[in-house]
Design a protein with these regions (language model features):
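N-terminal extramembrane/targeting module of integral membrane proteins
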Residues: 185, 194-198, 210, 220-257, ...
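Intrinsic-disorder/low-complexity loop/linker signature
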Residues: 149, 207, 268, 561-562, ...
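Short linear interaction motifs
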Residues: 168-173, 187, 195, 202, ...
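Short glycine-rich, low-complexity/disordered patches
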Residues: 194-212, 268-277, 340, 344-349, ...
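Low-complexity, small/polar and acidic-rich linker and loop segments
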Residues: 2-190, 204, 216
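Short, compositionally biased small/polar motifs
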Residues: 6-66, 70, 236, 243-310
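Structured, mid-chain assembly/scaffold modules that mediate subunit interfaces
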Residues: 141, 145-256, 424-427, 457-464, ...
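Hydrophobic, often aromatic-rich secondary-structure segments at membrane interfaces
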Residues: 296-416, 420-677
Length: 678
């Protein structure tokens, strides 16, 4: 091997690193050994030549990907700097532009709410809304939600078969399993294609079911050796490109990466989703696989994947599939806004802002976020999901259980107190341009509009709103959300369903979304400059300008009730479609106060579970998320959402200009008094 490396290095002339050369030679040797083992010595030369051609082809693709991503990152950096300039022009605070890109802000400059957070929710709920609607239409929703045992394994095999270049079919699978597998494959493929458009390079994984999920608690409990012994014979190392002599090292690094949440490159440097989502691979073979723990685990058969998932994963194909969709949506949003290296992009924009405004002490203080409610580090940790690393530790599990018991003990009557949502709905409808009487009429009727069944329910699902119960994410309305999967979380989901808070919230969100989509549909015949000022302002904050509106209004269609709606799925332009999805989802969360990444960044400050500070802050803010959200999304929007730089400036504009704030305070006070009578 050393002689080969020396010869190759001489010919290489420094174009590849020693690690990359070593990897290529290892691959060629593995091909040679495989031919010898199969008694095909006469084919060794041609096989090695073919393998070399494949590596060369992959190297060329890698160079093209790297070039594409460099160009995309330059454009995204320019857009971010333009966003900070717009923020500076309107508010005098350029740092709000970077905050807007991460978690969104209330100031109404263009792009202020088109954030990583809103896009993540928009993309994910566009997938999940369509998925749920398709499952309901095929009468498979109940089976999807309750998959287990032999039926679940059949669906896994169907999904794995569809992920082949030439599907062979699964003869022993039932008709329901085949139909369900096809629906899941439709959205899995859509998510993969969208990721590739955003900057990734993900090829078809032969026989793949879904991305492997891992229960770190179980893995830590059994230890490295037992985990390796169990998974060793279930993985297809040839498809992953792992040479036989490197299997042990790969499994060691995979175990460390999974239980710690920190992946490492061959040199031992940490690689996380923050700083590397879609690596522009510089080594030829690295395009097809990475030897480090960032490689995707590929199982030999769907049954091998299923057995592993039952023992060390989510133990649920449904949960693993939805987790895969959510991860894809998050990565798509991160790359769309921050490029292929989010951490580096945030750092670079900050440095440029510090250099640009180094002579302005007030702006520089805001850029460095001294004593600020939201730091860029905390915001980035929220949108990447890294703030949840450590949720598998014993400390995190125990305290999560305690908080869950407290939640069920103290929020039994939360449904009654949720009547105050009506006031927030009316206030947000005021911001959207409705009159005071119309806004309150909309607020009282929203829940009834959202309770409709049949075609209207299917139609509402495809808008991607009011799906929290289906997706198992509900307690975050009232808690500083800590996503710890397990039986306790399932009990909480059942609890909120039984105390009626879940159906109340979902119905209100569906109703509000139908109203907003109807507003947009009615105005779709008008040019952008002819739209009402309030509607034009809202569209602008989601990145929909005059050109975008011309594309968006092509999606206006009649709904099942005969009314005109702007349907995101009918919009031909992909990015405008996602912006409209983000608008609908975010406006529903503003109307029925639901915390987003911005509110969680304020509460959790970037501290992870399983640490002293992380657990303390989660207890401190356990029942504070609703109040904080009401201030940031309710009052805050009316205070800063019309362009005022300070509270004083907005309040000095008079009663009419502050009707939203007055309506929120008076409405919640009256409804709160009403609730206290029960």
């Amino acid at each position: 091997m050393a002689d080969c490396l020396k010869i190759a290095d001489t010919a290489n002339k420094g174009r590849l690193t020693d690690d990359e050369l070593d990897e290529i030679i290892t691959e060629l040797n593995a091909e040679k050994k495989e031919r010898i083992a199969a008694n095909k010595v006469d084919q060794i030369e041609s096989a090695i030549f073919d393998k070399g051609l494949l590596i060369a082809k992959e190297a060329e693709i890698a160079r093209k990907i790297e070039k594409r991503n460099r160009y995309m990152n330059i454009l995204k950096e320019q857009k971010l700097m333009a966003l900070t300039e717009r923020a500076n022009e309107m508010t005098g605070d350029p740092s709000l532009g970077l905050e807007a890109a991460l978690v969104g802000v209330n100031a109404p400059f263009e792009g202020a709410t088109r954030s990583v957070d809103s896009l993540t929710n928009g993309v994910f709920l566009s997938y999940s809304g369509g998925l749920i609607a398709d499952l309901r239409k095929a009468n498979l929703l109940v089976k999807f939600n309750n998959m287990k045992g032999d039926f679940e394994k059949q669906v896994a095999n169907v999904l794995g078969d569809l992920n082949r270049k030439n599907p062979l079919g699964v003869p022993n699978a039932s008709s329901d399993a085949k139909a369900l597998g096809k629906i899941l494959f439709k959205y899995q493929r859509a998510a993969t294609q969208r990721l590739n458009q955003a900057g990734a390079y993900i090829r078809l994984k032969e026989g793949r079911v879904v991305r492997a999920s891992h229960d770190q608690r179980r893995m830590v409990k059994v230890g490295l050796d037992e985990w390796k012994a169990y998974i060793r014979d279930k993985l297809d190392y040839k498809k992953m490109g792992i040479a036989p002599e490197r299997i042990d090292g790969f499994l060691d690094s995979a175990y460390e990466a999974i239980v710690t949440g920190v992946r490492k490159d061959p040199k031992g440097q940490a690689i996380t989703e923050v700083n590397e989502i879609s690596r522009a691979f510089k080594g030829p073979a690295n395009l097809a696989k990475k030897e480090s723990a960032q490689s995707v685990l590929t199982f030999k058969t769907p049954n091998d994947w299923y057995d592993y998932d039952q023992k060390f994963g989510r133990a649920s194909l449904r949960e693993a599939f939805m987790q895969d969709l959510q991860s894809s949506a998050r990565s798509t949003a991160l790359m769309e806004v921050l490029g292929t290296n989010p951490q580096a992009m945030v750092d670079r924009v900050r440095r440029r802002l510090e250099k640009k405004y180094r002579g302005d002490a007030r702006k520089l203080k805001r850029i460095t976020r001294e004593r600020a409610a939201i730091t860029f580090e905390a915001a980035l940790a929220e949108v990447t999901g890294e703030v949840n690393f450590g949720s598998h530790t014993t400390m995190a599990r125990v305290f999560h259980f305690i908080r869950s018991i407290q939640t069920m003990a103290k929020l039994g009557g939360a449904f009654i107190s949720a009547f105050s949502d009506i006031a927030y709905i009316s206030s947000n409808r005021l911001y959207q341009g409705r009159s005071l009487m119309d806004a309150w009429g909309d607020a009282f009727s929203a829940v009834f509009k959202g309770m409709k069944r049949g075609e209207m329910r299917d139609f509402a699902d495809r808008l991607g709103v009011g799906l929290e119960g289906q997706l198992g994410d509900f307690m975050s309305r009232f808690n500083a959300s800590d996503d710890v999967p397990g039986q306790t979380s399932k009990y909480l989901a059942t609890f909120f369903k039984l105390n009626l808070l879940q159906p109340w919230t979902e119905s209100n969100k569906r109703g509000v979304t139908l109203m907003i989509a109807n507003d947009l549909g009615r105005e779709a015949t008008k040019r952008f400059d002819k739209l009402p000022d309030d509607l034009r302002r809202i569209l602008g904050t989601y990145g929909i300008d005059q050109k975008g509106w011309e594309l968006a209004r092509k999606g206006a269609k009649k709904g099942p009730d005969g009314r005109m709606y702007l349907i995101p799925g009918e919009i031909p332009d992909l990015k405008i479609r996602e912006n409209v999805f983000a608008l609908l989802v975010s406006e529903a969360d503003n109307s029925v106060p639901s915390p987003g990444a911005r509110e969680r960044a304020i509460m959790r400050r970037g501290y992870r579970p399983g640490t002293d500070a992380g657990e303390a802050i989660r207890f401190l803010f356990q029942f504070k998320s609703f109040g904080i959200t009401a201030l940031t999304k309710g009052v805050g929007r009316h205070m800063y959402g019309y362009g005022a730089k300070t509270k004083r400036e907005q309040l000095m504009r008079g009663v009419g200009a502050n009707m939203g704030i007055i309506n929120t305070i008076v409405g919640t006070t009256v409804l709160g008094y009403f609730v206290m009578q029960f």
